[in-house]
Amino acid sequence: MQVMNLIEICYEDADVLVCVKPPRVLSTDEPGGLPSLLRQTLGEPEADIRTVHRLDRVVGGLMVLARNPRAASELSRQVREGAFEKQYWAVLHGTPEQKEDTLCDLLGRDKARKMTFVADAPAKGVQEASLSYQVLAQKEDASLVQIQLHTGRTHQIRVQFASRGYPLWGERKYSTRDDPCELALFSQKIGFFHPKTGEWMEFRHEPPSAFPWDCFQ
């Protein structure tokens, strides 16, 4: 693994680039966005670096980006068809009664407020959302959970846990708490088939050694 001045790069070849997106950095290609920062990190201002999936701006962790149009098309297909694996770690306030479970909800989107909400019944714009989780550790008013997404709705993890009374630490959009930390949600593992060779590739990364993550390290 190589650590650059701007962005930590975990793997790179002619087709793909796997890196760790810092919190507060946009996933999209615009000034200050992840592809732009990667070009600076690599010292290649004209490099073809394409976003094929996204993390919320406030979320950090592993992402894979494409290095050419063909790779972007193939990786995007995997994301659409569910062949792309994404696993997250989060720190919740409290501990769910079930240490391992699947959460299923109907989620809608309030575009004016830029917020996601749990809907009571099917309606226009409402989509099914599903995730599985496992409690890895508990400490006082916090629990470390591992999350596997089955759908990729906006703010899905944050809303599904907050609606059950277990908001993430650092959550300011779906909780009234004022935690002294960043949002405790991290893309800890990704897996995909290499767009050229077809080889399955899997990457893991530890969350930052800052509060509240350091309570479990």
Model-predicted segments: where are they?
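Detector for glycine-centered tight turns/loop "hinges" at secondary-structure junctions
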Residues: 113, 197-198
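Conserved histidine-centered catalytic loops in small-molecule metabolism enzymes
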Residues: 203-206
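A late-sequence structural motif
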Residues: 152, 198-201
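Non-heme Fe(II)/2-oxoglutarate
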Residues: 191-197, 208-209
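Pseudouridine synthase
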Residues: 34-38, 109-111, 140-192, 212
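Short, acidic, Ser/Thr-enriched surface-loop or helix-capping motifs
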Residues: 130, 137, 149, 194-195
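RNA pseudouridine synthases
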Residues: 1-132, 137-140, 161, 184, ...
